[in-house]
Amino acid sequence: MASSSSLRSTSCLASAAETDADNLCLRLGPPGSSITTTTTTGGADPAAKRSLGAKRSLESTDSMASGTGTSAAGDEHDDDTAAPAKAQVVGWPPVRAYRRNTFHQAAAAAAATKKGGDEKQKQQQQGGGLYVKVSMDGAPYLRKVDLKMCKGYRELREALDLLFTKCFSATASDGCSDGQFAIAYEDKDGDLMLVGDVPWEMFISSCKKLRIMKGSEAR
């Protein structure tokens, strides 16, 4: 019995010594923790703990890097979204809608008026009379004559003679055979030409204005 009691005491002392040794071992963890890692030798493996800590540090670093990349991508996206706002600043202040509409309406009205005037002139030339202004040197007024009512240069001369108090007849009766007055006209190009140089049809299509000038100026 005595030997059995001594064996139990020895076993308890050995167990207590082993427990004290385990408590005195250095571990990675907060104080008071009782985390034990068993290996094939039955003790704690500090190298494994260091490897575990390094792995956790690497994961933390990757996590932070990923967060930074996401933040940078978000900032870049925000910059791209804000870029059109800067482009809209160009051309400030903007033209208001009613001003644009007014401008377009005025332009359309001017185009319609011009088109209507051209059509009216074309219809007048085709179906109605072909009136041109007539001026005479020394006369304070202008007259108009319808070229379509004349069949040639002779009838045109007679019509002008009636408009300006028979100036051509008076000149002929005075014995001035060379003529005191001459008839000229202004063509499409604005050039002044003498009446009778071109065929009658060409004359009435290009005549814009008639002028009765002195014969001395026509020479």
Curated annotation (Swiss-Prot):
Recorded hits in SUPFAM superfamilies, A to Z, give: CAD & PB1 domains
Instruction: Show the GO cellular component annotation of the record.
Output: nucleus
Would the keyword tRNA processing be found if you checked this record's keyword annotation?
A: no
Q: Where in the cell is it found?
A: Nucleus
Q: Positions of the region Disordered? A: 24-88, 109-128
Motif EAR-like (transcriptional repression) mapped to chain: 24-28
Q: Could you tell me which residue ranges the PB1 domain spans?
A: 129-215
Pfam families of this UniProt entry? AUX_IAA (PF02309)
Show the Gene3D superfamilies listed in the entry: Phosphatidylinositol 3-kinase Catalytic Subunit, Chain A, domain 1 (3.10.20.90)
Q: Where is the composition biased (Polar residues)?
A: 60-71
Upregulating conditions: By auxin.
Biological processes per GO annotation: auxin-activated signaling pathway; regulation of DNA-templated transcription; response to auxin
Q: Which PANTHER family match?
A: AUXIN-RESPONSIVE PROTEIN IAA17 (PTHR31734), AUXIN-RESPONSIVE PROTEIN IAA24 (PTHR31734:SF8)
* Protein purpose: Aux/IAA proteins are short-lived transcriptional factors that function as repressors of early auxin response genes at low auxin concentrations.
Tell me its family: Belongs to the Aux/IAA family.
Query: What is this protein's name?
Result: Auxin-responsive protein IAA24
Q: What is the lineage of its organism?
A: Eukaryota, Viridiplantae, Streptophyta, Embryophyta, Tracheophyta
